Amino acid sequence: MKNDTQEPGIPMGYEENFPPVDMKWHANATKRFASPFVDNPHDRIDVDAIILSHAAVACGWTIRDFYEKPELGIHCVCYASELYDLLPVTHWFYSLPWTRELGLKLVYKDTLPPISTGPIISEPGDVDKIRVVDKEELKKNFTQQEFYRLYDYVAKQIPMTLVPISYGFDLVGAAAELCGVENFIMWTFTEPEAAKKLVKTYTDTSVNGAAGLADKYGMAMLIVGSVLANNDIFSDESVEEYSAKMMRYYVDQSFRKGAGPQVFYHLCGNHETDYKVFKDNLIWSPFTVFHVGYKGKNVFPSKLLKEEFGSKATLMGSVDTKLMINPSPITVYNQSKEQLLGGRDAPKGYILGNSCECPPYTIPGCMHAMVKAARDFGTYGTW
């Protein structure tokens, strides 16, 4: 029997803290979500604000709760998606999956996702000490067990929102954490073979993680990005060599091992000129979403995104993440409008998103401004 006098807090049984999903809303959101992939426009252009810990904050918990209690975190995402009228599917992740298995120690913080306590190697010769972790070993270890537990919870409690997702995420950035970001950047100039081997070791481990998820659930959507590898740090040539080619390798190898066919490519940060190297390097399945955050200091224009990648994938345009904590919903609305007008007629469909993760303390009025703009300028049949 449930103890109604229990003090606020969450043991397990996270589902007891949330009302059931409104299935009328969910049915409409599902048709809307499928629109770009089945060429059957429904309702309006979708909004994917890349909600993570904001979902927990919006429901009254903390950033730390979101990451330390994945089942709670993903249920918060489910509830926040209905609250804001976003996507009908759930997700939960952080930026350093599979790194524990490679030897990195992660710690939880009150205001941050899990972060590394520091590099585990410091010399190029040490790269050989880090080995690829195979699929069966990963299945027994922390990251894969965490995802199994997470998706089993979703399958039981909110099954209509389940999409098993495996994260390669930032192949270059995660690999760089193993030796220290400053060391890694230097090695790309002085010890390029060591730097490349480190990225490949992390990538192969991530592929095995995707395969392990596909073994259990029959599929695994892939999310992979270029975050550290951007024009603020690297040349176009280096972004291509270290990131774009490895993203292709990650998707190709994951597909061959049963993952996919859904792919989300997330180019975070400044990709002012290096965006050009991705078109001919990436693998484009019929269920691909492609997203670029910034071009220089400004959000990447959806018009340019459409011109360059509209024939390749469903596109996700960007609203500047910084605006989401600025007390000016009209600014968010106007930028959303500009991006929608630039990308809404993309041949394979368009989604409106943030340039990066929705800030934990996003102003609800700013979130509403994005969705309102999508209704006002993204309703199918009105342009």
Where are these regions (language model features)?
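Short active-site-proximal "capping" loops at secondary-structure junctions
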Residues: 52-57, 96-98
